[in-house]
């Protein structure tokens, strides 16, 4: 399997006895979770037959036909009821929220969620806050771009604005520091190019980046 750093890390963070990977593409995450001993069984789920056929080929190549099962499913619609952990990665934050909201009973049956949006992570954190989930741990994955990985369990939390945009309980490592430095650079450019009377958004972002860095004991 030609595994990206991002997919390998996501799979390494699974720890549910039975894991469902939503939008499975080639089925790498579902297979790695089992191969690495992180899950006893997994479901590789996708809305389209094409990606599911790729997943079936991966499952067969790994000789995991008795432990990894392809499931044709529109989001969570057909995810089996014994699923304990839901993984959704490789899509935008808005789509992740839509998937989690579409079949609330399916979402509620899971004990934990592993979510890795490639954009708009603040929407995912807001959804978790509003729907009875608490962020247990976050990581930053650097693989060409920066990708947050959010692990959530059931519970209540109240996020500050900087936490909604830059994470809660973020693991303080080089990737997290590099992400905040990159954000600081980007928003400084935007701030400096924006007319003074329209800088509020950029100024807030820069303030939140500094708060996030302070929480990690880092300097952005």
Locations of regions flagged by a protein language model:
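Conserved alpha-helix/loop element of class I SAM-dependent methyltransferases that forms part
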Residues: 1-17
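Class I S-adenosyl-L-methionine
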Residues: 2-3, 94-220
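Conserved class I S-adenosyl-L-methionine
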Residues: 16-25
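Glycine-rich SAM-binding Motif I of class I
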Residues: 27, 31
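Conserved SAM-binding motif I beta-strand of class I
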Residues: 41-46
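Conserved Rossmann-like nucleotide-cofactor binding loop
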Residues: 50
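S-adenosyl-L-methionine
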Residues: 53-81
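Short SAM/SAH-binding signature in class I
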Residues: 83-90
